[in-house]
């Protein structure tokens, strides 16, 4: 019989990897709480129209990458490819915006049919924040600073913030006209994908990875030249705010992001921790999305980071600096003790002892194999515990437990089997 495998691009997360994963999530949760963001959880499956209206039908995400199907009620459903549209839908459905601005964060799986590669899978995971009802340019600065500080606290090095302004809807309309006119005169020099985008989503041509197209764009009109005075002033406030916080940035005039709902501030944070600059976080302002989805015109700003890519970066940082923040975060936490036991009475006593120590807050690995003491000691060494607690029927009869150090060659010693205070003091001693 053929062995069943996970689908391509759908990766199992095993216990050791999840310890690192949860450590990163815990740090993120702390940062979000300190900044006043509350967690929201939305379904992984949504009506397809949510993403067609929200993301834009001309985008690659909607046109090429979504997992879409009809359910048994013949409703078109889609596994969510990103989190923002779902958060906005939930906020509208539950009337959250009537209560004033909402600061929300989320974490969970997303789905896109892309070519799997390191740090990018077809089921991938994002952590993101959405500040609904935030009109001020200072809010843009605050959410960018939140992302920057989170990544820095994870020990991620080589960070670079790329920044651009996409302007207002009118600004982009004027720029689109100028860009299309310029590109149409040179359409024979464009790569195939860029020619296809010329009449559907021309701004995405700026993000082309084709080297010849990038070289051609060096002479193209820039979006900055199409910004109205109000948009320029707003962008200047963002830059000044970041400078006042000591957050360095680089203006990137071709940064447009991949989703249609962005306006004004757009940004990406990259890291060279993997050898080349890799994007670990991206976002920006989206003042029109809530209105597009049936709500009142409401300004908003947010970002998302990809957990798979971030974990690669964090682990690279840990390898580069074994004593740094990343190494401490990604270290697999071993149990406080491994409970070795053999014999009918010892097995009963070991179960009671393990439960008592766990209830007191310790991590105890209880061996239930019934194997020989030598085999159990080998397992104890492999698990990384500092101590082995040894119980045989003889120890139980004497009312004691043998403590065997595993991290050095010091002598074994005994403590009372029911001396929980003494055991706790010893097992938690540095």
From Swiss-Prot:
<dbReference type="InterPro" id="IPR004154">
    <property type="entry name" value="Anticodon-bd"/>
</dbReference>
<dbReference type="GO" id="GO:0005737">
    <property type="term" value="C:cytoplasm"/>
</dbReference>
<dbReference type="Pfam" id="PF03129">
    <property type="entry name" value="HGTP_anticodon"/>
</dbReference>
<dbReference type="InterPro" id="IPR015807">
    <property type="entry name" value="His-tRNA-ligase"/>
</dbReference>
<dbReference type="InterPro" id="IPR033656">
    <property type="entry name" value="HisRS_anticodon"/>
</dbReference>
<dbReference type="InterPro" id="IPR041715">
    <property type="entry name" value="HisRS-like_core"/>
</dbReference>
<comment type="subunit">
    <text>Homodimer.</text>
</comment>
<dbReference type="InterPro" id="IPR045864">
    <property type="entry name" value="aa-tRNA-synth_II/BPL/LPL"/>
</dbReference>
<protein>
    <recommendedName>
        <fullName>Histidine--tRNA ligase</fullName>
        <ecNumber>6.1.1.21</ecNumber>
    </recommendedName>
</protein>
<keyword id="KW-0648">Protein biosynthesis</keyword>
<dbReference type="GO" id="GO:0006427">
    <property type="term" value="P:histidyl-tRNA aminoacylation"/>
</dbReference>
<comment type="similarity">
    <text>Belongs to the class-II aminoacyl-tRNA synthetase family.</text>
</comment>
<dbReference type="Pfam" id="PF13393">
    <property type="entry name" value="tRNA-synt_His"/>
</dbReference>
<keyword id="KW-0067">ATP-binding</keyword>
<keyword id="KW-0436">Ligase</keyword>
<keyword id="KW-0963">Cytoplasm</keyword>
<dbReference type="InterPro" id="IPR004516">
    <property type="entry name" value="HisRS/HisZ"/>
</dbReference>
<keyword id="KW-0030">Aminoacyl-tRNA synthetase</keyword>
<dbReference type="InterPro" id="IPR006195">
    <property type="entry name" value="aa-tRNA-synth_II"/>
</dbReference>
<keyword id="KW-0547">Nucleotide-binding</keyword>
<dbReference type="GO" id="GO:0005524">
    <property type="term" value="F:ATP binding"/>
</dbReference>
<dbReference type="InterPro" id="IPR036621">
    <property type="entry name" value="Anticodon-bd_dom_sf"/>
</dbReference>
<dbReference type="GO" id="GO:0004821">
    <property type="term" value="F:histidine-tRNA ligase activity"/>
</dbReference>
């Amino acid at each position: 019989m053929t062995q069943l495998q996970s689908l391509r691009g759908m990766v199992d997360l095993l216990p050791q990897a999840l310890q690192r994963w949860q450590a990163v999530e815990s740090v993120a949760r702390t940062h979000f709480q300190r900044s006043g963001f509350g967690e929201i959880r939305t379904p992984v499956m949504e009506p397809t129209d949510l993403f067609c209206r929200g993301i834009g039908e001309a985008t690659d995400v909607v046109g090429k990458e979504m997992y879409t199907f009809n359910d048994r009620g013949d409703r078109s459903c889609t596994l969510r490819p990103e989190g923002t549209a779902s958060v906005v839908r939930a906020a509208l459905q539950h009337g959250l915006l009537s209560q004033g601005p909402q600061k929300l964060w989320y974490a969970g799986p997303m789905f896109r049919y892309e070519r799997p590669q390191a740090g990018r899978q077809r089921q991938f995971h994002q952590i993101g924040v959405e500040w609904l009802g935030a009109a001020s340019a200072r809010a843009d600065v605050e959410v960018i600073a939140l992302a920057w500080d989170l990544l820095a606290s994870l020990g991620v090095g080589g960070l670079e913030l790329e920044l651009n302004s996409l302007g207002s809807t009118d600004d982009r309309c004027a720029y689109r006209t100028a860009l299309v006119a310029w590109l149409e005169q040179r359409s024979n020099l464009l790569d195939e994908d860029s020619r296809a985008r010329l009449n559907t989503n021309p701004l995405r041509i700026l993000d082309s990875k084709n080297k010849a197209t990038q070289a051609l764009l060096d002479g193209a009109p820039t979006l900055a030249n199409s910004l109205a005075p109000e948009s320029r002033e707003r962008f200047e406030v963002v830059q000044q705010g970041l400078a006042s916080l000591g957050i360095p940035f680089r203006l990137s005039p071709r940064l447009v992001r991949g989703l249609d709902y962005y306006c004004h501030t757009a940004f990406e944070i990259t890291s060279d921790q993997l050898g080349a600059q890799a994007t670990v976080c991206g976002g920006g302002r989206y003042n029109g999305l809530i209105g597009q989805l049936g709500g009142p015109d409401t300004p908003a700003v947010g970002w998302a980071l990809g957990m798979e890519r971030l974990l690669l970066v964090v682990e690279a940082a840990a390898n580069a600096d074994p004593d740094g923040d990343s190494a401490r975060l990604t270290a697999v936490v071993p149990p406080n003790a491994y409970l070795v036991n053999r014999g009918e009475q010892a097995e009963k006593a070991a179960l009671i002892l393990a439960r008592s120590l766990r209830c007191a807050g310790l991590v105890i690995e209880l061996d239930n194999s019934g194997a020989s003491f030598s085999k159990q000691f080998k397992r104890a060494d492999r698990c990384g515990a500092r101590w082995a607690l040894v119980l045989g029927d003889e120890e139980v009869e004497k009312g004691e437990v043998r403590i065997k150090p595993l991290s050095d060659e010091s002598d074994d010693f005994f403590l009372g089997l029911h001396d929980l205070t003494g055991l706790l003091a010893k097992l938690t001693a540095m």
